[in-house]
Regions:
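Catalytic helix-loop patch of NAD(P)-dependent Rossmann-fold dehydrogenases
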Residues: 85, 123-176
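Mid/C-terminal beta-alpha module of Rossmann-like enzyme folds, strongest
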Residues: 230-279, 312
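NAD(P)H-binding glycine-rich loop region in Rossmannoid oxidoreductase-like domains
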Residues: 40-93
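C-terminal amphipathic/interface module of NAD(P)-dependent oxidoreductases
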Residues: 282-316
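Alpha-helical substrate-binding/gating segment
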Residues: 194-202, 210-244
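NAD(P)-dependent short-chain dehydrogenase/reductase
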Residues: 161-166, 173-176, 180-211
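N-terminal Rossmann NAD(P)H-binding glycine-rich loop of SDR-like oxidoreductase domains
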Residues: 4-24
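Conserved Rossmann-fold NAD(P)-dependent oxidoreductase catalytic core, especially the SDR/UDP-sugar
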Residues: 92-147
Length: 316
């Protein structure tokens, strides 16, 4: 079976992708900063610009997930630079390694994010319960938004784009998956939603009407594998579920699954979020409605298209 080299393979998404690949019979190698010699792992050092040449030479596919967590820390100037550099420098190192190392890599599947897009252009975000709403959302041809996340995503995709160049060692098929808010019981955004619910408190952010374009981690892992296996796919694709939800709907759905009717609801004012999160508060208060139509047209079928099915099967 084919060998897949994964960067960022120990994170939330990387672990799900790795496990699915192994279930399907692929051989998986994780690129890691650790110098410990261990089967299934290879070393790279982004800051030093070094990478295990054997890992590149023996890979059939590369899944590129490396990057500092966007929401892990408050956005200081230094942290924003780290978020950007961890993505662009790792991409540049992969491009350089592919160019300099004889290899058989058929495709590179890279993460990106719906941070590419800005706030919704229309007022449709207030009707996030409508099953047809995603069809009205952002599509892949929309330009990147000129804020921190938009410019970061644009630089991220641009930094990996040279793998398609018509030169020796490159000429790879490239797919960039612009990922929405990932829902998983193992961490990520859902962990933050669950914290106040430990006190039976459904904490709705702002007015709660802002649209969340989300994706179940199981569908996202399936999508990365799908991108490997479907040679007709290339370019950018939105990795979001077909039915986005409002912040209020997501929060109350979670509360109902955990406690039935026996929970309290509280609204967290915008000014409190701005004090707590700083610039990042803009991201949790804005609506970004994104359409997955392109990936669906490519034949991908979501197992968890609606929030109720996703949350009810996550074994929270």
């Amino acid at each position: 079976m084919a060998r897949v080299l994964i960067t960022g393979g120990t994170g939330l998404v990387g672990t799900a992708v790795k496990n699915l690949l192994l279930q399907k019979g692929y051989e998986v190698v994780l690129l890691t900063r650790s110098t410990m010699s261990k089967e299934g792992y290879a070393h790279w050092d982004i800051n030093a610009g070094t990478i295990d040449a054997t890992a590149i030479a023996t890979a059939d596919y590369i899944i590129h997930l490396a990057g500092a967590g966007v929401a892990d820390k408050r956005w200081s100037v230094a942290r924003k630079q780290e978020i950007l550099d961890s993505r662009t420098k790792s991409s540049a190192l992969l491009v350089k390694a592919l160019e300099e190392t004889p290899n058989k890599v058929k495709a590179v599947i890279s993460a990106s994010a719906i941070g590419w897009y800005g706030p919704d252009k229309n007022s449709h975000s207030n009707n996030a319960h409508n099953n047809d709403i995603a069809a009205q959302g952002f599509v892949e041809t929309d330009p990147s938004y000129p804020d921190f996340l938009g410019t970061t995503c644009a630089a991220w995709e641009a930094s990996i784009a040279p793998v398609t160049a018509n030169t020796n060692g490159l000429q790879k098929r490239l797919v960039c998956l612009r990922t929405g808010i990932v829902l998983s019981k193992h961490g990520g955004a859902l962990k933050e939603f669950l914290k106040p619910l430990a006190l039976r408190m459904a904490a709705i952010l702002g007015n709660g009407k802002q649209t969340i374009s989300w994706i179940d981690v199981r569908d996202l892992a399936k999508m990365f594998v799908y991108a490997i296996e479907n040679e007709s796919m290339s370019g950018s694709y939105n990795a979001v579920a077909p039915v986005p939800v409002s912040n209020k709907t997501l929060t109350k759905t979670l509360a109902s699954l955990l406690y039935g009717k026996f929970y309290m609801t509280a609204y967290v004012p915008s000014f409190i979020l701005k004090i707590m999160l700083g610039e990042m508060s803009i991201e949790v208060l804005k609506s970004t409605t994104v359409s997955p139509q392109k990936i669906q047209d490519a034949g991908f079928v979501f197992d968890y298209p609606e929030i109720s099915k996703s949350l009810s099967t996550l074994d929270l």
